[in-house]
Amino acid sequence: MLAGGVPHGTVAFAYLAVVFAVTGINHLDGVADAGDAAVVHGDPADRRTVLKDTTTGVGAIAAVVVVVAGLVTGSLGVAALPTWTAVGVVVATEVGAKTSMAAVACLAHAPHDGLGSQFTGNATPGALPAVAGVALPVALASVPSPAAAGALAGAVGAGALTRRWLTGLLGGANGDVFGAVNEVSRVVGLHAGVVVWTL
């Protein structure tokens, strides 16, 4: 057990509490809005209209439940890792999630003025090498285990796929895309790190 015999469930709960206390829960709103938009039939403009609706739909509920379940099960897996490996996986996952958000800013455009345009308007694809240069060293955070490298790769890969899907769905990157990319990257990063450790 991690943390000197503390039960895995307690460690997982503490992880979730700290993550949401530090980063906030606004990213989950992006997940919810993306879930609602995903079930709308129509073009990107029709889907963006749903984002302004204050009613929570089944798509939002399903998306948030899946993400939170992914975080819970991923953090339970991390809690079973040796302490140094667990720390490496958590750090690499967070760096990967933020790297994915930076990639959204560098590679996507915003469909309208708002939070998304504040980021995409000030970033270019030319900034990606610097982003990668800052992120890559964290892959060594769990040496000799490659778990942190797996977490980083999983988070960044999931972020890229989510960015591509959501920007196509919504016709660009608004604030909800940034939030959803962050959360999906976090979930996949945790699981990827745990899976790599078991190999």
From Swiss-Prot:
Q: Which InterPro entries match?
A: CobS
- GO biological process, alphabetically ordered: cobalamin biosynthetic process
What Pfam family is a match, any one?
A: CobS
Q: Where do the TM regions start and end?
A: 2-22, 61-81
Q: What EC class is this?
A: transferase
Q: Does the keyword GTP-binding apply?
A: no
Family membership noted in the UniProt record: Belongs to the CobS family.
Primary role: Joins adenosylcobinamide-GDP and alpha-ribazole to generate adenosylcobalamin (Ado-cobalamin). Also synthesizes adenosylcobalamin 5'-phosphate from adenosylcobinamide-GDP and alpha-ribazole 5'-phosphate.
Q: Which HAMAP family match?
A: CobS
Q: What is this protein called?
A: Adenosylcobinamide-GDP ribazoletransferase
What gene name is listed for this protein? cobS
